[in-house]
Swiss-Prot record:
The keyword Magnesium does not apply. Belongs to the UPF0758 family. Residues 108-230 form the MPN domain. NCBIfam families: PRK00024.1, radc. The keyword Signal does not apply. SUPFAM superfamilies: RuvA domain 2-like. It comes from Trichlorobacter lovleyi (strain ATCC BAA-1151 / DSM 17278 / SZ) (Geobacter lovleyi). CDD domains: MPN_DUF2466. This is UPF0758 protein Glov_0523. Keywords: Hydrolase, Metal-binding, Metalloprotease, Protease, Zinc.
Length: 230
């Protein structure tokens, strides 16, 4: 059956019809990818679902790795050209933006778990470390998210002067620091401990409270406050 065009399949087995009848959650990852790809490779006798399955196999079924893939990596699948690769990249990017913009609906943060819930989709797929600062007002309401750095963290890159400049400029009452560990393990390094100590001291001098520093891994997080280190 996989060598036939999807339009020739029984109606209840076609991804689009299945989605319309049963909802998107009823589709497999390969079927969802097929809808993004729209067509297969007729010359090779591959349906869009076949291409979706090959993509998943190429990345060991890991959607996180697939989301991180560059266009040239996606095109290594025979029958998957630039247009299809761009569609996949666009779909994953749109999902990330949706997660990021959920932040705008929040009135205030109440716990490290809530921070993790809102940011792990955005940060866990990055191959580089990103350091973010959340600016909050006196009622712990988010006013802005600032990206401080991208790349391996060290004390010269994450310097208190650069980190607190937006908070001072916008009269923030408090800040929350967030960064990711591309390895997936959120356990803090010695450098993470030292950076947190320095930033907390700077916050005390400036009168800007550091509410937490949260490290995001793959499905887990580390909170300096919950661990009694801040």
């Amino acid at each position: 059956m996989s060598n036939n065009a999807i339009k020739d399949w029984p109606e209840d087995e076609r991804p689009r019809e299945k989605l319309l009848k049963r909802g998107a959650a009823a589709l497999s990852d390969a079927e969802l990818l097929a809808l993004v790809l729209r067509t297969g490779d007729a010359a090779a006798g591959k349906s869009a679902i076949d291409l979706g399955r090959e993509l998943l196999e190429r990345f060991d079924g890991n959607l996180r790795e697939l989301a991180q893939a560059e266009l040239n990596e996606l095109q290594q699948i025979k029958g998957l050209g630039l247009a299809k690769a761009a569609s996949i990249k666009a779909a994953f990017t749109l999902g990330k933006r949706f997660q990021a913009r959920r932040l705008e609906t929040l009135e205030r943060f109440t716990s490290p778990a809530q921070v993790f819930d809102f940011f792990h989709h955005e940060l866990r797929d990055n191959r580089k470390e990103l350091f973010l600062t959340l600016l909050l007002d006196g009622k712990n309401r988010i006013t802005r998210k600032v990206q401080v750095s991208e790349g391996s963290l060290n004390q010269s890159i994450v310097h208190p002067r650069e980190v607190f400049a937006p908070a001072v400029r916008e009269s923030a009452a408090a800040v929350i620091f967030i960064h990711n560990h591309p390895s997936g393990d959120p356990a803090p390094s010695r450098e993470d401990h030292e950076i947190t100590r320095r930033l907390n001291e700077a916050g005390e001098i400036l009168g800007i409270k550091v509410l937490d520093h949260i490290i995001i891994g793959d499905g887990a997080y580390f909170s300096f406050v919950e661990s009694g280190l801040l």
